């Protein structure tokens, strides 16, 4: 069987800088709790990490939204916290509580991390990627992903989600050497993880820096831009031709510097980014992806239709991938997603 060329995959064409009408579309968390078939598979798996680490089921939930909506890209079903789990930290997902980790408290904890075990321990994830590469439609692109080092570090230091990131920030300010040592481990482990995903069949990579926006400018440069830039350059050098999308959520005006200094091929915009500014300032630098508010997808109706039109009118004249500003939320009606796809793909 011949491998489809990238020119047959609109998502990859857009990331290569082409302007397409209609633009390619996929949605963050397109495999998720809003789909009844996902909830059934999740129940079959038991725990959330069991679902991530069971290739047959992870392939199934990745394919479920493609069957309904024929998105232009599939994204590996996994979680950013499989990386800390693979390098030696306990990770659990508790109902109503989110992720719970055994927090790092010392330099000794950092030095005890085991990045050399990552590939072996994440073998099931790479098996999922291989399964998806052979199962997705020929015009659908396969996205691999990881959390950015800063965002993953916050979970490892805070022990889970945080309102103020006081522990992680205190490591930056009062224990800079220890924090830098942790980030070095995560930069190396993340690069290794993404290269292994590419080798298993991922055709593009997205790096999620969910908590990028909580850092002041100086720290944003040091702990968001520099690590993602290093990972992006390593991927470009070692696996040329595989595009990288950065998603520094909440970066504000620093989005421009982020694009220029990391060398990403595409950038995910959160819902707060002004569209006219993005079209004028960001789109000449790289492909932009986003950025409808996920709650408008819950609302549906005229408000959603107006938002889709605004996005297409403003960003549709350059390299653009339609997406949300963050992930689909569980209360989203599946029929609203179908309507969204129809709107994006309607002749203009």
Swiss-Prot record:
SUPFAM superfamilies: UROD/MetE-like (SSF51726). CDD domains: URO-D (cd00717). One of its GO terms (biological process) is protoporphyrinogen IX biosynthetic process from glutamate. One of its GO terms (cellular component) is cytosol. The keyword Cytoplasm applies. Keywords: Cytoplasm, Decarboxylase, Lyase, Porphyrin biosynthesis. Homodimer. This is Uroporphyrinogen decarboxylase.
